[in-house]
């Protein structure tokens, strides 16, 4: 019987061929534990927000599940899964190009997230396609803002609420400084003969800066960003399109239902981002399942 948080077998079959072969884990010894069981254990961690040691025994030893999560982060498996799913959704016409939305959200960090070395002796990386690659920052993307100790998550989604890219910074950093960075981390592969950038890009007043508007103009994208009080009024502002921006806030709300994302427990930023990729994979699979006609 399938338990809560576990992946439906029909959706599992879509990504099973993309995972490393269970008998080839890169070293000597016994074959890997069953991928499906391990993945369900990782999904349980994502949704429950519990410590690794509290993982139910039905998913195997917690060390095994934790090691598999880290191995797939280091070899780029998580990022490749999300990239493949987004490309599959793109081919089916499920990704909108009319309006993309950018936003940032403060994530409170638990005291357990503090204490990692500022300069770890060995490289900590999130591997995968170029847009997903991340080197562990010295700050571990942790800092103090008005919301307290935490991380700021910058993200971009399309007009159906499908998350396309993510980046993390210390909580006190302003979102306007990382607009181009999060856009560069969009994981949708470019297909020849198809427009890549959207017709419109929506953001709140925090993105009303000259360098952002220049970037949008350079890429042929219309900005749907309200001006601040100290700026000239934008007579071409599309108020009706701006109302659609709430899709990114609804998407953030869905992801924050995953307790491991709503509060940061990971000491390393690369592990926290990897959990976001796991959540993106799960949500993309749901969209893919809804789009199935066979």
Give residue spans per PLM region.
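Short alpha-helical elements
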Residues: 1-294
């Amino acid at each position: 019987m399938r338990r809560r948080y576990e992946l439906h077998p029909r959706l599992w079959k879509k990504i099973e061929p993309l995972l490393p072969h269970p008998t080839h884990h890169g070293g000597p010894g016994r074959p890997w534990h069953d991928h499906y069981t391990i993945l369900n254990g990782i999904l349980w961690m994502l949704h429950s927000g519990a410590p690794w040691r509290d993982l139910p025994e039905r998913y195997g030893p917690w060390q095994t599940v934790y090691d598999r999560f880290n191995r797939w982060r280091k070899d780029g498996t998580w990022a490749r899964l999300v990239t493949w799913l987004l490309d599959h959704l793109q081919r089916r016409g499920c990704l909108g190009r009319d309006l993309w939305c950018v936003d940032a959200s403060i994530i409170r960090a638990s005291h357990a997230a503090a204490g990692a070395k500022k300069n770890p002796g060995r490289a900590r990386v999130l591997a995968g396609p170029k847009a997903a690659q991340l080197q562990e920052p010295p700050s571990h993307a942790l800092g103090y803002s008005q919301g307290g100790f935490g991380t700021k998550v910058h993200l971009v989604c399309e007009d159906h609420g499908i998350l396309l890219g993510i980046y993390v910074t210390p909580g006190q950093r302003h979102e306007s400084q990382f607009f181009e960075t999060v856009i560069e981390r969009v994981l949708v592969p470019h297909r020849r003969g198809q427009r890549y950038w959207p017709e419109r890009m929506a953001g709140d007043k925090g993105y009303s800066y000259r360098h952002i508007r220049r970037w949008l103009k350079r890429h042929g994208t219309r900005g749907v960003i309200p001006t601040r009080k100290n700026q000239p009024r934008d007579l071409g502002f599309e108020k009706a399109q701006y109302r659609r921006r709430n899709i990114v806030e609804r998407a953030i709300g869905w992801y924050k239902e995953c307790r491991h994302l709503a509060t940061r427990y990971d000491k390393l930023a690369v592990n926290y981002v990897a959990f976001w990729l796991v959540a993106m994979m799960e949500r993309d699979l749901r969209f893919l399942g809804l789009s199935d006609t066979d």
